[in-house]
Amino acid sequence: MFALCDVNSFYASCETVFRPDLCGRPVVVLSNNDGCVIACSAEAKQLGIAPGEPYFKQKERFRRSGVVCFSSNYELYADMSNRVMTTLEEMVPRVEIYSIDEAFCDLTGVRNCRDLTDFGREIRATVLKRTHLTVGVGIAQTKTLAKLANHAAKKWQRQTDGVVDLSNIDRQRRLLALIPVEDVWGVGRRISKKLNALGIKTALDLSEQSTWIIRKHFNVVLERTVRELRGEPCLELEEFAPAKQEIVCSRSFGERVTDYEEMRQAVYSYAARAAEKLRGEHQYCRFISTFVKTSPFALNEPYYGNSAAVTLLTPTQDSRDIINAAVKCLDKIWRDGHRYQKAGVMLGDFFSQGVAQLNLFDDNAPRAGSAKLMEVLDHLNAKDGKGTLYFAGQGMSQQWAMKREMLSPRYTTRYSDLLRVK
């Protein structure tokens, strides 16, 4: 038995938790460089605002409607997500963190001693008490059904109190008959059009199809979806995320970059962040690549995009090695006379910690004390905030940095941003 817990309007809700004065007002969160809307509060959705709308086109409309806009505060969202997930882990035997605002919970054995709907309400109340965030809870025998139950809990929140238990077969079928097939988890737009052409309009229609025919005309993934809709578990709970095969750190610049030194600072920063992520995965890498590009949509400007890569003989997780390799790649592809829109660093060819072997012919032998130095670097930046300790090459006044003109305070991770109570 699974429960899917999903925070309602997560990004927007994180902003309003610390701003009670915004209660009842429409709130939107913008993407990198304040480009477009990526999250809306319920009040904003009622005004017809949808994710993907360019901010510069809607700016005047937002002003007239009293919409409050925020730049993306990823540090705040990550910490609030961690608080939600920690709460869930205390309440259920196992948790799979599916995304920043969603988690599948294992309810095996819970129904033997608790009513599942009551337990769902307890999850909701506990998360609300500890984080002031509201979650929808969908309970069912499979992940796919739990997704649909969660969808119903949020769509009909007033009638369901935010909790839907689909363990009853009759209730399952009634809900499946109401859900369009395109709203089923794992059914994309292209597949849903093909299903509609075959007369399969609802989730119930899909659940009643022959698995053999579905597999023959579509694929094994959709066959699993059909089985899951019938209450047959095909997707197990994954407590540990699979090891990453690559790490990419890139951003569009707040302003176009034309100066090599500014680009070098950006590549320094992206490489340092990628190395930090690599150590967080307990991995070493051999492949380091840097890319730069101008905007493909710029008028009267020639497009330029290029990348270069370095393969090390000995795997590393030292920021200094990765930065040096990334800058060497930049030197190969940098061309004067362009207005660059974006750059990034990619790491690949990973080795697990303790598996990496030295190479007799490698001129760049591992640095003495590298592991301890990187540990201190990561510890200070985790304890006192990102950027507490950084490389000089990253620069101090980063003109190229991502534009976030409406950034809220990092209320939960920076002492300087703690709320002051009068």
From Swiss-Prot:
PROSITE patterns in UniProt: UMUC
GO biological-process terms attached to the record: error-prone translesion synthesis; SOS response
Single GO MF descriptor: DNA-directed DNA polymerase activity
Record Pfam families: DUF4113 (PF13438), IMS (PF00817), IMS_C (PF11799), IMS_HHH (PF11798)
Protein name (database record): Protein UmuC
CDD domains for the chain: PolY_Pol_V_umuC
Species this protein is from: Salmonella typhimurium (strain LT2 / SGSC1412 / ATCC 700720)
NCBIfam families, alphabetized: PRK03609.1
Function: Involved in UV protection and mutation. Essential for induced (or SOS) mutagenesis. May modify the DNA replication machinery to allow bypass synthesis across a damaged template.
Domain of life, per lineage: Bacteria
